[in-house]
Amino acid sequence: MTTASAYQALDAWIDAHFDEEVRFLQALVQVPTDTPPGNNAPHAERTADLLQAFGWQAEKHAVPEAEVRDYGLTSLTNLIVRRRFAEGGRTVALNAHGDVVPPGEGWTHAPYGGEVVDGKLYGRASAVSKSDFATFSFALRALEALAAQPGAPTIQGGVELHFTYDEEFGGEMGPGWLLRQGLTKPDLLIAAGFSYEVVTAHNGCLQMEVTVHGLMAHAAIPHTGIDALQGAVVILNALYAQNALYKATTSKVPGITHPYLNVGRIEGGTNTNVVPGKVVLKLDRRMIPEEDPVTVEADIRRVIAEAAATFPGITVDVKRLLLAKSLQPLPGNVPLVEAIQKHGQTVFGQAIPNMGTPLYTDVRLYCAQGIPAVIYGAGPRTVFESNAKRADEYLVLEDLRKATKVVARTLLDLLT
């Protein structure tokens, strides 16, 4: 069997089993994994049952309940499937996360229905990233089927599926936990992504909670209190002014522009007739790969402290909620990039650029352990196009079919 005919055999197997792949994804979408609250062990159990039908015994690695609850989640089990072929060769891991933000409002399709309309599968996590549970599982199944054919190329090494359930909170209880426990150390990694680019770098993220303390008072005698909300407005204005300055700092990574800051949540006050005594802000600061996280955090704390000092009477507590470092490409990722670009060009009929993304992902945790990695999977050109984290999230099924072929072909290249 020639290499070209091996690629054709992979493609043909995926086409023949594509209806099954769609049903597999529907079954995954139909089990909610809203995070918060993050009660995601039931989804891992369902996934393990589905994988067992393929002849795979998924290892169930339950994170201890106390760790999970201290982290702010409810239940969490990570899965590893290990499929060994001939001796020697690399181990390539494929990682996708099953946790996802709650659906919110405005849906015209059931968020957990997995409904297929006009070639699109709708549902929360259909694009990010239960889609790549399907991409990676069926790419591996296609490789297994090829290996069983007479005259097929000798496949050496192995593939691991890492299906994890902590990406929304930063990944430390997902891939981070598996890596810290010494449960895996692959040679290469492909993580869930989209189909029209291969991502080798991404932004970092700093999330902080800012608590502004004032003094409650009756609204009829406001001079007897200290308005924490007015103090918070001063801090907000300083942060937004700083955000405007970030546009002058640009990244050299294609696909990444400049740093930015978002205040995503504000809580405070007790009633309309009470001067607010406490206000809590939660902010998200995206860091380009060229930035130093320590410097960024120190600068945010400086801006907050200087602003607070201009409003007499308030005190401020600042707590770090999350620090996710940016993804810096490792030199060893070249075989991954080249294979995905080659097969993406063939299957999609267009160039697959090597890009960065303003998102942050679990991939950084693998790279921090020296594991070369890229981000690639089933999905559209942009996050916005997929409606991820918005109503009516969907996946174009032809993207799923083609991305599965690209990943299967890439695995063949890496393991022969």
Spell out what each predicted region is.
Residues F85-E87, G114-E115, A152-I155, R180-T184, ...:
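Solvent-exposed alpha-helices and their adjacent loops that cap or buttress functional pockets
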Residues T2-L121, A145-I155:
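Acidic/His- and Gly-rich active-site-bordering loop/insert found
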